[in-house]
Amino acid sequence: RWWAWSTNSNWKHPYGEASSINGLNNHPVVQVSWYDAVAFSEWAGTSLPTEAQWEYAAKKGEVTNSRAMNIWQGVFPVNNAGSDGFEKTNPVDAYKPNKIGLYDMAGNVWEWVADWYRPNTYLMGGRDNNPIGPLSSYDPMEPTIPKRVIRGGSFLCNAQYCTGYRPTARMKTSPDTSIEHTGFRCVMSQEQMGKYVNQINN
C-alpha cells in the first residue's frame, strides 16, 4: 500500500497513533502543515526559503543520479523494493550531500517553501534574480483552494509516477495539509545569522 488512511497522525506519530519518532531523530520531521513549518521557523529565528532560493540551492548542487537519492525503488505502486534500506524517510546523512553541502535536496520528503502557488510564477517573475513569488494563489485545477509550493520530491517519487525529484519540478498543496512525505528546511538571512551568532556569544 502506498496510500493509507490513518487517524491521529502528527509529527510525533507520523504513521498513525501507534507510531512514534523514537529512533528518527536524524530523519526529517513530517506530518507538518505549512503553518506548522512557518511557526517553527519563526520560533527558531529563521524562515522558510522562497521557491527561488530553494531552486537555486538545488540547481547549484544538482544530483543527477537517481540512485543517490531516496525515491521509490521498484515498480510503482505495486512493489517498493527498498533496496537502499529505506521504505520511507532516511536519516539526513544516508546519502552524500550535493555539491554545495546540502543533504536530500532531491527525494526523501517534499519540502514546504514560502511561496504561494501559481502555474505561471516564472513568467510573472520575469528576469528577477531573486523573485519573491506571487501575492496570492491560483490553481486552475482547484481555483477555490489556496495552495503553497512544495519542492524536491519524496520517497514516493518514481519515473513511473512522479518525477518531482528534478530541481525544476514543482508541486502544490493546501497549506493546512500534513502528510507523511512532506517536511521542510529552514534558511537564515545574513541578518538572522548575525542575531544567532550574537545570542551564542552573549
Language-model features: locations:
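Short, structured beta-strand segments at or near domain termini in extracellular proteins/domains
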Residues: 180-195
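Functional-site microenvironments in short loops/helix caps that host divalent-cation chemistry
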Residues: 1-167, 171, 175, 180, ...
